[in-house]
Amino acid sequence: MTLSFFDQFLSPTLFGIPLIALALLLPWTLFPAPSSRWVNSRLLTLQSWFINRFTQQLLLPLNMGGHKWGPYILLVMVFLISINMLGLLPYTFTPTTQLSVNMALAVPVWLMTVIIGLRKNPTAALGHLLPEGTPVPLIPALILIETISLFIRPLALGVRLTANLTAGHLLIQLIATAAFVLLPLMPTVAILTTILLFLLTLLEVAVAMIQAYVFVLLLSLYLQENV
C-alpha cells in the first residue's frame, strides 16, 4: 500500500474507535504531581521554575483585573507545549496539526474575552469597532472592517498553529525520506541530509514552544482589551 505524506495527520483509530481523545489526555500523565516532601525532585523543581517564569511573562501584558485568568492561560500554554513536543517523537500523532482541535481551543477562549468585555464595559468593547477621530463617510466601512477583524481572530489563532506545525512535520518527513532513499545510493549525501534533519528537528522543537507561546500571548492581548 502506498502511503501519502499526509497520512501522518490522520486521526489514529483502534478497531474503528478514534484515539484523538487519548492523545489529548496523554500529556497530563507526564507531569509529576506536587508532593508533601520538603525537598522536591529535580523534575518537579524544573517544572515549577518553568511554570513560574512563563507565568511572569504571560501576566506582563495584563492589568490586575486580568491576573485571575493567569492560571487558565498558563494551563492552555502547558497543554499546547506538551502536545507539540510529544508530536515530534517518531510514530506519534500530533492533535494540534488538526484545524478542528485548534479551533476548538481558539473559539471558546476568544468568545470568553468578547463576553467579558461586553459584560464589564460594553461601551469600550463596542468602541474598538470604531477608532476615535474617524471621518463620518468612513464610519460604515470601518465598522464592517473591524467587525470582520474581530471575528477572524479565532480563525487566525487556529490556522497559524495548524499551518506552522503541519509545515514542520512535512519538512521533517520529506528530509527523512530523502536520507533513507539516498543512503544506499550516495552515503555521503545521506549523512549530510541526516545532519540537516537533526538541525531541522531542533528548529521544530523551538517552533513547537514558540507557537504555543504566541497562541497564549495573543490570547492575553485579546483579554487585555476587555478587562
Curated annotation (Swiss-Prot):
Pfam families: ATP-synt_A. The chain crosses the membrane at residues 14-34, 69-89, 98-118, 132-152, 180-200, 202-222. It is found in: Mitochondrion inner membrane. GO terms for molecular function: proton channel activity; proton-transporting ATP synthase activity, rotational mechanism. CDD domains: ATP-synt_Fo_a_6. It catalyses: H(+)(in) = H(+)(out). Keywords: ATP synthesis, CF(0), Hydrogen ion transport, Ion transport, Membrane, Mitochondrion, Mitochondrion inner membrane, Transmembrane, Transmembrane helix, Transport. The keyword Transport applies. SUPFAM superfamilies: F1F0 ATP synthase subunit A (SSF81336). Signal peptide: none annotated. It is a multi-pass membrane protein. GO terms for biological process: proton motive force-driven ATP synthesis; proton transmembrane transport. GO terms for cellular component: mitochondrial inner membrane; proton-transporting ATP synthase complex. It comes from the Eukaryota. Its main location: mitochondrion. The keyword Amino-acid biosynthesis does not apply. Belongs to the ATPase A chain family. Subunit a, of the mitochondrial membrane ATP synthase complex (F(1)F(0) ATP synthase or Complex V) that produces ATP from ADP in the presence of a proton gradient across the membrane which is generated by electron transport complexes of the respiratory chain. ATP synthase complex consist of a soluble F(1) head domain - the catalytic core - and a membrane F(1) domain - the membrane proton channel. These two domains are linked by a central stalk rotating inside the F(1) region and a stationary peripheral stalk. Component of the ATP synthase complex composed at least of ATP5F1A/subunit alpha, ATP5F1B/subunit beta, ATP5MC1/subunit c (homooctomer), MT-ATP6/subunit a, MT-ATP8/subunit 8, ATP5ME/subunit e, ATP5MF/subunit f, ATP5MG/subunit g, ATP5MK/subunit k, ATP5MJ/subunit j, ATP5F1C/subunit gamma, ATP5F1D/subunit delta, ATP5F1E/subunit epsilon, ATP5PF/subunit F6, ATP5PB/subunit b, ATP5PD/subunit d, ATP5PO/subunit OSCP. This is ATP synthase F(0) complex subunit a.
